[in-house]
């Protein structure tokens, strides 16, 4: 397909804009380089060797036991709620709403003590 006049005009305008911003960008980069060369004398860089040695010495333990901070959540299989009454993170709001309706039906059925008269297949 051929390119339209509007498309060609937009391409030309983008090229002009690119050239215009290239000048500003070049000046900005030159300023950054000059500042970084001035700061190079002030800043002292650390080598990675001592840092890595510290990590390896801290990471290894002699007894070989691990400390576990997080306790496993206890979830009720029937209600799918944890001990605080919250649903799991992976469960979306629609599923939570559906689960609550299901639990309410069970509560009503349990309170009335009657079995529904609907035909069960």
From Swiss-Prot:
Q: Which domain of life is it from?
A: Eukaryota
Q: Return the GO cellular component terms, semicolon-separated.
A: cytoplasm; extracellular region; nucleolus
Q: Which GO terms describe its biological process?
A: dendrite extension; learning or memory; long-term memory
InterPro entries, per database record: LLPH-like
Q: What is its main location?
A: cytoplasm
Q: Which organism is it from?
A: Lehmannia marginata
Q: Give the keywords, sorted.
A: Cytoplasm, Secreted
Where does the UniProt annotation locate this protein?
Answer: Cytoplasm; Secreted
Molecular function GO terms recorded: basal RNA polymerase II transcription machinery binding; RNA binding
Its gene?
LAPS18
What this chain does, per the record?
May be involved in modulating long-term memory formation and retention, at least with respect to odor-taste associative learning.
Matching Pfam families = LLPH
Q: What is this protein called?
A: 18 kDa learning-associated protein of slug
């Amino acid at each position: 397909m051929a390119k339209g006049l509007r498309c060609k005009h937009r391409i030309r305008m983008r090229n002009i804009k690119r050239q215009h911003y290239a000048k500003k960008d070049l000046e900005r980069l030159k300023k950054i380089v000059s500042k970084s060369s001035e700061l190079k004398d002030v800043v002292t860089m650390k080598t990675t060797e001592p840092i890595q040695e510290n990590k390896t010495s801290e990471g290894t333990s002699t007894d070989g036991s691990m400390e576990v901070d997080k306790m496993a959540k206890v979830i009720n299989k029937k209600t799918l709620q944890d001990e605080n009454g919250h649903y799991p993170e992976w469960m979306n709001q629609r599923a939570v709403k559906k689960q609550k309706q299901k639990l309410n039906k069970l509560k009503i059925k349990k309170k009335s003590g009657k079995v529904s008269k609907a035909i069960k297949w």
